[in-house]
Amino acid sequence: MEIEKTNRMNALFEFYAALLTDKQMNYIELYYADDYSLAEIAEEFGVSRQAVYDNIKRTEKILEDYEMKLHMYSDYIVRSQIFDQILERYPKDDFLQEQIEILTSIDNRE
């Protein structure tokens, strides 16, 4: 499995998990976050390996569709880059640093 795809799916899952069904959440989390094989997930849920594969592929598409419409992950990346640039340019500005910490904590809320 490609590490870039795994990282992206894990990130998209963090942003959009609440929009998925329980089954979709379980399969994606086991497959990407916990590194279960399709066979292990199939055994765990008493379904075929093909059923797990199909569900994961559909859920990947759903996550990508959510990102295309909502841009939560890509916006988060841009905000993080801007915060880093501000902190680098104004390292001694305590007010800016405090405000960025507040904004970052809002972004990282669960």
From Swiss-Prot:
Pfam families: UPF0122. Gene3D superfamilies: Winged helix-like DNA-binding domain superfamily/Winged helix DNA-binding domain (1.10.10.10). InterPro entries: RNA_pol_sigma_r3/r4-like (IPR013324), UPF0122 (IPR007394), UPF0122_fam_protein (IPR054831), WH-like_DNA-bd_sf (IPR036388). PANTHER family: UPF0122 PROTEIN CBO2450/CLC_2298, UPF0122 PROTEIN YLXM. Might take part in the signal recognition particle (SRP) pathway. This is inferred from the conservation of its genetic proximity to ftsY/ffh. May be a regulatory protein. Belongs to the UPF0122 family. This is UPF0122 protein SP_1288. It comes from Streptococcus pneumoniae serotype 4 (strain ATCC BAA-334 / TIGR4).
